[in-house]
């Protein structure tokens, strides 16, 4: 065990807003909902560069998002525009797992892998 495992990961409170993404929709139509291409465009959150620094992560790192008892791991992407305290997620199973939008949540770095869509679907059924 590493010493870092005992330390709490820094968190950042954010408001999450969802949006439709044309590239994600195209990947779904071209490759299917269960494809890696679709997951790579869907299981993401766009964060402000300042928020990334607060939680000690960089573009492409996995993050855990927690909201009202629900949680999901997605890939953090650095936004080109400044919007501190606001995270943007494409409309998908990964964003829907967190609840009704806009939703208040905390985001922190994660060591876990991004769950596949079939894993998320089975989690929501059980």
Identify the residue ranges that each predicted region occupies.
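Long, contiguous, secondary-structure-rich segments that constitute the structural scaffold
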Residues: 1-47, 51-126
